[in-house]
């Protein structure tokens, strides 16, 4: 909602700032293999350049990945995840298109609620959908959630709880979101149904908790 000047405002550190402190940074680089026995990390950059780094101590902070909804139509244009810096940049750029008026946000957790509020502030028609019976379900008690729901509704956000998204429809671009109760016009859809730990890297050598 223009509370920050751009997507860079979402981050507390920059590449330049970290380099100024002596860190070696490889952006847009995928770690493909970790040799735990010999303490080496192998990676490939976006341009195909190969990297090999040795370590004394290794910190795995691979974060999380968006939960992938297995529904038809998720590949349509303007169906967005918002997880990475690049995702935020893409959404902000697309919102410059005046034809994007109706936005459906799927998922009423922290990210879904914040995005719904931000879209409403810039004049978009917002539908917030969640399978639960309230926003922020599992985070707060009913009293606080009721206040939050009232605040969202009072600010013009349409709340659609207890609904399961079945399909996203469109011809190349998204046009409609279909749930088990009704359908919603959509020029953009934000999928914000949560995250799972990104444990793929090195999991064959590490003991993981079941949760």
Spans of model-derived segments:
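Rossmann-like dinucleotide-binding cores of NAD(P)H-dependent redox enzymes
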Residues: 4-5, 10-11, 102-103, 110-167
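Short, structured coil segments at secondary-structure junctions
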Residues: 21, 74-75, 122, 155, ...
């Amino acid at each position: 909602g223009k509370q920050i000047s751009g997507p860079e405002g979402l981050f507390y550190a920059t590449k330049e700032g970290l380099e100024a402190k002596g860190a070696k940074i490889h952006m847009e680089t995928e770690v493909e293999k970790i040799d735990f026995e010999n303490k080496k990390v192998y990676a490939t950059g976006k341009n195909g350049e190969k990297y090999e780094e040795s370590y004394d101590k290794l910190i795995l902070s691979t974060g999380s990945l968006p939960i992938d909804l297995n529904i038809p139509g998720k590949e349509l244009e303007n169906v967005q995840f918002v997880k990475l810096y690049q995702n935020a940049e893409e959404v902000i750029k697309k919102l410059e298109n005046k034809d994007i008026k109706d936005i459906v946000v799927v998922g009423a957790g922290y990210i879904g609620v914040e995005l719904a509020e931000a879209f409403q502030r810039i004049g978009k028609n917002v539908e917030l959908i969640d399978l639960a019976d309230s926003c922020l379900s599992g985070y707060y008690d009913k009293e606080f959630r009721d206040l939050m729901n009232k605040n969202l509704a009072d600010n013009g956000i349409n709340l659609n709880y207890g609904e399961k998204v079945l399909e996203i429809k469109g011809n190349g671009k998204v046009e409609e979101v279909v749930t088990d109760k009704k359908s919603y016009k959509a020029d953009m859809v934000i999928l914000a149904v949560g995250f799972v730990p990104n444990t793929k890297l090195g999991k064959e050598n590490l003991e993981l908790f079941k949760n």
